[in-house]
Structure formats: structure tokens, C-alpha cells
Amino acid sequence: SDVYKRQVPNGHMAGSVSRVASSVDEAVAMVEDLASHNVDLIKLMITGGVMDAKVKGEPGILMMKPDMIKACCDAAHKHNLPVAAHVQSPDGVRAAVRNGVDTIEHGSVLTSHEIDAFKEKNASLVCTLSPALPMAKFPREILGITDVVQYNSNVVFNNMVAGAKAALENGVKVGLGTDTGCPYTTHYNMWRELKYFTKYVGVTPKFALYTATLGNAEIAGLDAITGSIEVGKSADILVADKNPLDDFKNMAVPYMVVARGKVYKEKLVKKYEKCETELDKYC
């Protein structure tokens, strides 16, 4: 999928993977331009982030004004494009959901106000513990990060866990993701996200597996195509030698993978052993 991230000056990822808009009109023009290139969705960077934060508490600061959020969402929805958003605070969640964002990536502590907004707008929360756990739990010297970054990472990690729990307890749809590309967050370790989901959020292995498969497909609007093994759906299957419900690590080295009907048996992924050794200490 093509994911395009929208941002404001000095916001999260501005100047790297994000386009930068200084006004509502400029932001809407960017959404229109992206829509003309047949993208799959629009992503907004609504609050600050951990890696670019300069002070403690900055990851949750609301960086994009509600009128810009709404204008971007309205423009995207006009083209039937869903809107995702990087959000790491209650204020950010409230501003995002109330102004049209469809899926919140990361999340935060949720009060009754945020829960009500999720339900009213039929929005979803995507929990991503994989990028936050190493930054919060690993010794700083391994990552080469500052005290500020680790402090913020702990806040973000704990708030994501609390937010996911609150969402599930109140009937808000929750998905799982990895935010791959962050330090010690690889493309091949989705199984760890499921394990974190059971360990820290407290769900059953069966529910975690559902969330990562059909649950995610439902959030993405792809459940008629993939997410479960059914007649007429795309054959997207990971086959393991042992039952993943006994231990999600059984998916780490699959017997084979079927993607869109094509079978892959050769182990094509080269893993970073130092990364695996450190991550194994936590699950």
C-alpha cells in the first residue's frame, strides 16, 4: 500500500517522510494531489513523536490544529480514502477522531470523552507496542538514546497499553501494527507484537491472533478479500510447524508462507541476530 504522511512545520517526521503544509488550503491541496496519484490512504502526523522530541512530554503535544485535521479528512473522504493518524496523547486522540480520522496509530490513555468519540465516529485504534518497548526497556547505551527519549518512550508505552485496554473494555475496535523502521523493529517480527499484546494488554492468544488477522483486515476494509481462510478470499497464509496459540514464537520460522496464492518455502529473510538476542529478553 502507498502510505503518505501529512504534517505541519516542525511536526513529527517533518522534512523526512512527511510532506509539510503551513495552511489549511495547502494541506487540502496536498491531499488532492495525493488522491490524483491513486494512493491507498492519507496519514496525518497530529502529535509530536518520541524520536524527534526535545523535551519530556513532547510526543503527545498536539501539533496539527483541528481545522486542518477536519479539512484533510473531508478532502480524503471525498475520494473514498481512509485517514490514519500518528497520535500519542488524549488531546490528540480527541482532536483526531472528532474531526474525521478513521484509525489512530499508537494511541494513549483514553477517558470517557475519547471513548465516546471513537464510538460516535466508528473509528479504530491500532496498538503498536513493538517500537516503544525497546526504547522504553532496553539499556540506553544499547540504543544510543538520551534520557529524554527513554522517559518519553516509557510514557508512550504505558499510555498505549492503558489506551488499548480501555478501548477493548468499551467496545472500540483495536488492531495491531509494528511501526517497522523504528530501532529494533523489524519487518519479520509481527509475532512479537502479538506476544506483547497478550503479555501487556492481557488478551488471550486466540484474541491476539484474530486481532492481527481478520481484525486488522476489518479495520483496513479488506475483510472481504483477506484476513481469514475462506472460499473466495485471497490465499494469504502463514503455515507453522507448531501451534502459534501455544507460543507465538512458533511463527518466527514458518514452514511456508502463501501470499496471494503464491507459495514461498525458501527462507529469504536474513535476520539481525543482535536485534533478536536483545528482543528475546523481553518475550
Each PLM stretch: what is its role?
Residues 1-4:
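Short, small-residue-biased leader/transition segments that mark boundaries at the very start
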Residues 9-15, 52-57, 140-150, 189-199:
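Short glycine/proline- and charge-enriched loop/turn segments
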Residues 22-125, 141-143, 154-174, 224:
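Histidine/acidic residue-rich metal-binding segments in metalloenzymes
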Residues 47, 129-132, 180-182:
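Short glycine-enriched loops at secondary-structure junctions
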Residues 78, 82, 143-148, 157-243:
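His/Asp/Glu-enriched, well-ordered alpha-helical/loop segment
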Residues 107-112, 129-133, 202, 262-263:
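Short, acidic/turn-prone active-site loops that include or flank metal/cofactor-
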Residues 124, 128, 132-151:
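Active-site loop ensemble at the mouth of alpha/beta enzyme cores that anchors a bound cofactor
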Residues 212-214, 231-277:
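C-terminal cap of metal-dependent C-N hydrolases
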